[in-house]
Amino acid sequence: MQTSERTFQNMLKEMKPLFWDTDPDQLDQRRNGPYIISRLLNMGGMAGYCWVKDLYTKDEIIWAVIHRRDLKPVVRSFMAQQYHIPKETLVRQIPWR
């Protein structure tokens, strides 16, 4: 798939099962960016990671990785390594009680 074809709408079609609890028509690429980034990274595998890199800037990705509490620890660690984010700056996941 060429870069020009990798649009937000194409991502929603390809990754629709990941957004089972959300109305895709209500998702906004920028306003809901951190939510979309975390969902793609947590459940989208390598395809989700590639979509994140294609759709979002480095700063948007770093912000989501630092601030989203729902990222899996392995995803958070991988992204911290990829984007050289100091682990001390990452928000810790809150365990279920």
What are these model-predicted stretches?
Residues 1-97:
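Long, compositionally biased intrinsically disordered regulatory segments in eukaryotic proteins
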